[in-house]
Amino acid sequence: MITFKDSIEIKAPPEKVLGWLIQRFQSKENYQAWHPEHVDIRWIKGEPLKEGSIIYAEEYLHGQLHKLKFRIIKIVRNREIEYRALFPFSLFVPGNAFIIESKGADSSVFTATSLLRAGPLFKMLGKKRMEDTKRHIKEEGENIKRALESPK
C-alpha cells in the first residue's frame, strides 16, 4: 500500500478552512477554481457532505481524465472528511481523507491523504503517475492556503 500525504500550515482557523473546502464541493465552478485539473463535480446521492452521500467528480490525473464516484464515509465537524472511491477504482484507491488540525486561534494544518494499492510492478512502471498524484495533492493544499491567506 502506498500512502500519498501532504500537509500545509494555513493562517486560518479550522472552521474557515473547512468552510472554504465545503464551497469547492458545491458547484462545478467552485471545484474548477480549486485546481486547474478539476473539471466537474456533482452530488448524485444524498445531501452534500453527509455520511453515506455519493459525489461524482471529473479531474485530470497524470494527464488523463478520470471520472470518479466517492462515498462520504466520515465527517467530523471542522476536523475531517473521509471518503472512498466506488468500484472499480476502490480496488486501487481504498481511502482518502482531508484532515484539519487546529494550531491555535488563527492557524491550522491541512492534510490530504490518499491510499493506493499497488504492487512492485506498478511502483516501478508507474513512477510518473505517482509523482503526478503527489504534485496534484500538494497543489490542492497550496491553493487552499493561497485563497485563505490572500488579502481580499
What does each model-identified segment do?
Residues 40-88, 139-152:
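Glycine-rich portal/gate segments that line the openings of hydrophobic small-molecule binding cavities
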